[in-house]
Amino acid sequence: MAKSGGCGAGAGVGGGNGALTWVTLFDQNNAAKKEESETANKNDSSKKLSVERVYQKKTQLEHILLRPDTYIGSVEPLTQFMWVYDEDVGMNCREVTFVPGLYKIFDEILVNAADNKQRDKNMTCIKVSIDPESNIISIWNNGKGIPVVEHKVEKVYVPALIFGQLLTSSNYDDDEKKVTGGRNGYGAKLCNIFSTKFTVETACKEYKHSFKQTWMNNMMKTSEAKIKHFDGEDYTCITFQPDLSKFKMEKLDKDIVALMTRRAYDLAGSCRGVKVMFNGKKLPVNGFRSYVDLYVKDKLDETGVALKVIHELANERWDVCLTLSEKGFQQISFVNSIATTKGGRHVDYVVDQVVGKLIEVVKKKNKAGVSVKPFQVKNHIWVFINCLIENPTFDSQTKENMTLQPKSFGSKCQLSEKFFKAASNCGIVESILNWVKFKAQTQLNKKCSSVKYSKIKGIPKLDDANDAGGKHSLECTLILTEGDSAKSLAVSGLGVIGRDRYGVFPLRGKILNVREASHKQIMENAEINNIIKIVGLQYKKSYDDAESLKTLRYGKIMIMTDQDQDGSHIKGLLINFIHHNWPSLLKHGFLEEFITPIVKASKNKQELSFYSIPEFDEWKKHIENQKAWKIKYYKGLGTSTAKEAKEYFADMERHRILFRYAGPEDDAAITLAFSKKKIDDRKEWLTNFMEDRRQRRLHGLPEQFLYGTATKHLTYNDFINKELILFSNSDNERSIPSLVDGFKPGQRKVLFTCFKRNDKREVKVAQLAGSVAEMSAYHHGEQALMMTIVNLAQNFVGSNNINLLQPIGQFGTRLHGGKDAASPRYIFTMLSTLARLLFPAVDDNLLKFLYDDNQRVEPEWYIPIIPMVLINGAEGIGTGWACKLPNYDAREIVNNVRRMLDGLDPHPMLPNYKNFKGTIQELGQNQYAVSGEIFVVDRNTVEITELPVRTWTQVYKEQVLEPMLNGTDKTPALISDYKEYHTDTTVKFVVKMTEEKLAQAEAAGLHKVFKLQTTLTCNSMVLFDHMGCLKKYETVQDILKEFFDLRLSYYGLRKEWLVGMLGAESTKLNNQARFILEKIQGKITIENRSKKDLIQMLVQRGYESDPVKAWKEAQEKAAEEDETQNQHDDSSSDSGTPSGPDFNYILNMSLWSLTKEKVEELIKQRDAKGREVNDLKRKSPSDLWKEDLAAFVEELDKVESQEREDVLAGMSGKAIKGKVGKPKVKKLQLEETMPSPYGRRIIPEITAMKADASKKLLKKKKGDLDTAAVKVEFDEEFSGAPVEGAGEEALTPSVPINKGPKPKREKKEPGTRVRKTPTSSGKPSAKKVKKRNPWSDDESKSESDLEETEPVVIPRDSLLRRAAAERPKYTFDFSEEEDDDADDDDDDNNDLEELKVKASPITNDGEDEFVPSDGLDKDEYTFSPGKSKATPEKSLHDKKSQDFGNLFSFPSYSQKSEDDSAKFDSNEEDSASVFSPSFGLKQTDKVPSKTVAAKKGKPSSDTVPKPKRAPKQKKVVEAVNSDSDSEFGIPKKTTTPKGKGRGAKKRKASGSENEGDYNPGRKTSKTTSKKPKKTSFDQDSDVDIFPSDFPTEPPSLPRTGRARKEVKYFAESDEEEDDVDFAMFN
C-alpha cells in the first residue's frame, strides 16, 4: 500500500511524481492500480471503500517503516541551531539542516556502545568511523562481547536475536537497577530497519566464539551467521549503511556529519575512563571538565573576561559544571550517555539547587530594589550535567527529555557550599545584577519625559517659573526650600526679583541618598521624581554640551535651607543626587545656594549679619561693650520675616553662593561623604577633623568658617570639608554617648531640665518634653524627646539597670520590649531619688555649660560618681562609627571603684542586667553567650521560664513557638500545644510535645531547638572622651580606668571649690559675728553716720569686703579667662561691682541680730562652719568619693527594697484594704505564674559556641588592622545554641569559695557585693542591626537618643547592709539661684527604629534547623525520675553558701576567673540575697556549686541536687537585700508538693545540716542558731512565694523529709535526678 505524502523508499523517492512506493512490500503494478482506484473513488464519491481496505493491520516492521516518526522522530529535513563540531571551528552552535531520524539511529548504536561501559568496567575504547562518501558508519567498542550462544527459547544466536528481531532486549527487568541508555528494545533494531546494510560483529571470550551476520534491505534479508572459534579479547562492532532514501537524502552531508562528530565528542566527555577514536584519531577530551572547555573556549563575558567554569564531581554518578550564559538558560546534559538536548527532571533538579542559592546572594546584593524571580536567575545560567540515572524514563523514543522523578534517580546530587560560593563569584551574580540595573534604569526612564513641557501638572506645592520650559528656560532657576515655611520666605522674596525666571518647590525634610538607595526606594520617592519632572532631567542622559542643556526646563537649581547642620546635610544630599546621576551638570554651574544670616547683632540703627557661628564669635572677641548690642539667633528660615526676605532677595549678590566645580578633587569629596564604600576613609576624615578642632581649642584658635563677607562662591570640596563635616560630627555626637556621663545630648537635656525644675511632684511626660525644649533649646521634634524621657524611665528586664526617672504609669514591659508604653499624654514621671546621688549638685559648679541661642543650657557632660555608660549600657550608629555596650551591675562597679581608690586593680566584670534570670557566659574577649531557662517537667512537657536578654515575650511567641506549633514550609510541627502563664515581668511558657520529639529535642539541645541561646560580640565600644573626641575602648576596664582618673581629678576640684566656698562663708560669718559683738561692746557706732564713713570705718578695722561675693567673682573671672568667648549675663554675678568694697552683708543685718538668741545662734553658725572647713581640709578626694558611694548604695538599697514591697503588696495573697474577697483565688492565680517544682533544669552548653568564637577571634586578629575605631557594623550574631549538658562552662564560679569554716559575719560597707551564683557572661540577643547609612536623607532613619540597652542580667547577690556613713551636706549661705543645668541633644531621634536592636530569637548562625525525626527508638531516650546518684560527701563541703531560690526567676551565671575571690572577703560570701535562688542540699546530693564546677568537673544534668525548702516566713524584719536578682528584687518563697517537704527548721550556723531547708507547710520554729532572724511575711499570707532574707550560711547536713502541700510550683522535683534546676544556683 502506498499513500501520497507518506514516507517511502525505492525508485519513486525523489522522482518528483509525488507518489511514494514500497518496492519490497508490494508489486509496482498493484500499487499503480491502487492509485488509479483511489483516483476513481475521488471522482465517483458514490463508490465507497470496502471495510477491509479501510481497516488494515500491519506487521511491526511494516508499521515502523510506515510511521517512522513514532520510533525515530521525523524523517523530514529540519533546520535549527544546534551544537556541532566542525574541524576548522571546533565546537560551535550554528544553524544546521539534518534529519532527526537519521541522527537518532546513529545515536542508538553509539549509546549502546557507551552502555557496555556500565556492564564492563574494563572497557577502555570506543572507535567511531564515518565515511560520507561510501555512506558507511562503524562503531566499535572493546567491552564485553555479546554471548555467542544459541538462545534456548528463541532457537537463534543471541546477537542475531537482539539485533535482528524486534522487541528483544536485556533491559526488560525493571527490578534490576541499571544505569544504561537502552530501555525499550527498539534502538539497534531501528538502525537495522532503516539501513540498506547492517552488520554485527562480536567476539565473546567467555564462549570462545566470534559472530558476524549481515542484514540488508531494511532488515528484510539476512545472511547466514558466521561463527568461528575465538581466543582473543572481547569486542563488538556495528557497521551500517543508512537507507538515505528513507530520509530523503542522497549522501551524508556536512551538517549531519558535524552533528555525529559532536556526539562522538559527547561520548568522550560523558564516558569516564573511555578513550574515543574518531576516524582513527583519538579525540582530545579527558573527562567531563575538558569536554566543557570545548564549549566555553574563547568565550568572554560582558566585561571581556574569559568565562569561568565551576566544576564539581558530586559523586560517582553526578558530574556538574556551571558557568555564565549570555543567551538565556542553556544546558548540555547527559543521562547514561544519552544527550538530553531538551533537558528534563535531572536538569531541573540541579538547576533548582543552584538558583535557590544564587537568588539568596542576588537579593543581598540587589541594591536596585527590582524583584528578582527564579526564572530570571535561571536565564543567566549555563549548566553542564553528566549523570547516571537508574532506569530512566523519557517522553519519547527519541530520548531528548528525561521524565523520571528525582526520588527515583537512585542517587542524590548534593552540591557543596564551596561549589555554591564559587558559583556566586563566577560572574553569574554580576550578570544578574547588571540585568537588574538595566531593568531598573528602564523603569526609571519611564518616569522621565523626553519632551520639554512649558506647563506641568500634578505636582502639589510647586510654584513654577513663568518662563520654565520655554525658550528662556536656561535662564530660569528653581529654588528648592527646606519645608513650606521656607517656601513662604522665598515667595515673599520673589516679590522683589519677579516670578518669570524663578520657581519655588518645597522639600519635605531630607531627600534620599540616591547613591546607596535601592531601585524601589528611588522609584517610590515622590520628591526625587518630582524634582526630575520639574527640571526636565532624564536618566542616563549626558549634559556635556550646551545643546543638551536646552532640553531642561530650568537652567539652575538654588538650594535654600536653614543655616544649621541639618540644612547643610540637605544641601549635601542634593549635590549627591545630581553628582550621582548627572555629574556633568556640576561642571556647568548647575547648583547654587541661598544663605541667610544665622545671627544678627543690632545697635541703634546699625545692624550686622553673620552667616556662621565662628564668624560671630570672632566678632564678639573684638567688640567692646557687647551688652549694648541686641543679639538675635536665626535657627531656621522661618525665623525671618517677610520684610527680611525681601531684603535678602534685594541683595542677591550677597546671599547667592555659586558652587564651582574644581576638578576630580570635588568628585572625590562628594564620594567620600556619601559612598558606602568609603566608610574607612570617612573615619579618617572625621578623626582628622576632631583632632584639628581639639588643637585649635588648645591653642585658642578660632574655628574655620565658610561664609565671610567676601564669599561669592565655593568649591564642592570646601563645602564637604568645612560645612558638611560639621553635620557628620554632630551626627556622631547625637548618636554616640559620652564616656563621662553615658548620655547622648537629648538625654542630657532631659536630665538638665529635671534638675533645674527640681519637681517634688510627678509631671506628665508630654509636659516635661515641652519644658525640656524650652529650657535646653532643643531644636527637634518633641515626639522624639518624649520617647527619650520614656526610655530613661523604663526599668523592665533588658532596659535600664538604674532608671534616672521614675516610671509612673505604663512605660513599657518586656512583653513588647517597651513598645507597649502608653501615650506620653497619660503617663507621669519625676526624678528618681538616686539621680542627685549619682550626679551631686555640688559638682554642677565644676562643669562647663554650653550656650545655645544666647541661653545657658546643659553642660558639655555631667560627672556622675560611677560610670553610667556601663550601668545602663549604650548603643548608637553614627557616621563612620557605631557604639554598643552592655549593662553592668552598679554594686560591682562601686566595689571596683573602691578597690581602685585603695590602689588595687579592678576585678574583671561581666555584663549584668537587672532581674534577668538566665545565664550569661563568657565565650572570649568581648564575646558572650546569653541563655534563657528551660526545664523538663515530665515526659512530654517543658517549661520555659526565661528568655535571652532583649528577646521579648510576644516576639518569641510569634516567631518561635507559633511556627513550632503550626509548622512551616521547611520544617514540620514540633510541639503539640503551649500555654502562657507569664506576667509583665516574668516569663512562663508550658510547652507540650510528644515523648519522642522531646527526646530528640533534648538530644539536639533544648536551648538550640527552642532558640533560647544567643551570642553577641561587643567590639564596638566607641565613646566620646572628656575632650570630645571619639575613642575606641578595647575592654570595659579601660573605660572604668579612664573614668576613674577623670572623676578623681574632679573630686580634687570639688574639694578646692568647697574649701574656697566654705572658707569664704566662714570668713563672712566670722566678720558678722565680730561686728555684732563689737557693736554690743560699743566698739563700733553706726548711728547717724554716713554710708561712706561706715565703709571707711569697717575697712580701717580690718573687715573684709563680702568674701563670698569676692570669691565667686574670682571664680567667674578665672572661668572667663579660660573661655573668653562665652561672656554672657549671669544673674549670680550681678550683686555688686568689683570697683569698691561691699559691706552689705554686714550693714544689711537686721536689728534682731543684736538679740542674745541671735548672737548665740550666729556664734554657733560661725563655729560650725569653721569645723566644717577643717573637716573638709582633712579629707582627701578619695574620702569624698567614698562618702558619695556609701550614700548612693544606701539609697539604692532603699529604692530596690521599695520596688520589692510594691510588687509584694499586690502579690502576697493578702486581702487589700477596702476589697472584699478571698485571697485564695489570688494565690491560685499567682501560683500559675510560678515555675513548676518538678522541673529538671537544662544547663546551657557553650562549648561549641566558644570554639566558634575562638575561630572568629583568630580571623579577626589576622585581618584586623583598624585600631582607631570600629566600623559601622556590629559583629553580633545569633548563633545556634550548642547541645546541652552539664558543663564546667555553665558553672564556672565568679568567686572561688574558701574551704574552711566561715567566720562570723561581719558588717560590711554598704554596696559590697558578693556574687553567689555562677554567672555566665552573655550578651543580649539582637537581630543583625541593619546598618543605617549616616547620610540617609530619611529622617525616620536618623539618630536617636533612645538607648536600647543590651540587657544581660547577673543575679544580684545579697549583701549585709549597715547604715551608710552620712554624707556631709554642705550648706552655702548665699541666696543666689543655682546655675542652670542643661542637657544638649541635637539628636534627630530619627534612627529610633534602626538603632533598636530588634530582639529576634530566631537565628542560629551556622546551625541547622532542628527537624525532629519520628523514628527515634524509645530506648534511646529515657527520663530518669529515679533517685539521684550519691556523690562523695566531700562535695557538700565544696559548697559554702546556699541561697533560696527566687520563685519567679532563676539566677544568671557569670564566668569569672578564680582570682575574683580577692574581690570580696570571706565574710561577704555569707551575705546572700533573698532573691538569689539556691537550695540546701543533701549530703549525698551532687552540688554543682562554684567550687564543684571549677574543680570537680561537669555536674550531670541528671544528678542535680534537690533544692531544700525554706521555712515559712512570718514577717519581714530585715530589709531585703537589694542585690537580689529577682524581679524588682522581691523576696519570694517556694512551695513543694505535699509529702515532699522537709522539716520547717530555720537555717543553722555553719555546719548545720538543716540550713537552707524550707517548708511552706509549717510555721517557722525558733532554733538555737546564732544567725540573724530570718525574714518572713505575715502568717496570714496565703501564698508565701518569696523567700525572705535568710543568712546564707553553708549547709552542713541535709534534711530528711518534706512536708506535703497540694499545689506547688517552684521547688524541687520529686525525681532527684531531675533536680538540676535550682540547686546549682548558688
From Swiss-Prot:
Positions annotated to bind Mg(2+) 1: E482, D562
Domain Toprim: residue ranges: 476-593
Tissue expression profile of the protein: Expressed in the tonsil, spleen, lymph node, thymus, skin, pancreas, testis, colon, kidney, liver, brain and lung. Also found in breast, colon and lung carcinomas, Hodgkin's disease, large-cell non-Hodgkin's lymphoma, lymphocytic lymphomas and seminomas.
Protein name per the record: DNA topoisomerase 2-beta
Phosphothreonine modified-residue sites: T1292, T1403, T1575, T1592
Lineage: Eukaryota, Metazoa, Chordata, Craniata, Vertebrata
Gene (name only): TOP2B
Residues that hold ATP according to the record: 112, 141, 169-171, 182-189, 397-399
Location (main, coarse): nucleus
GO BP term (any one): resolution of meiotic recombination intermediates
Task of the protein: Key decatenating enzyme that alters DNA topology by binding to two double-stranded DNA molecules, generating a double-stranded break in one of the strands, passing the intact strand through the broken strand, and religating the broken strand. Plays a role in B-cell differentiation.
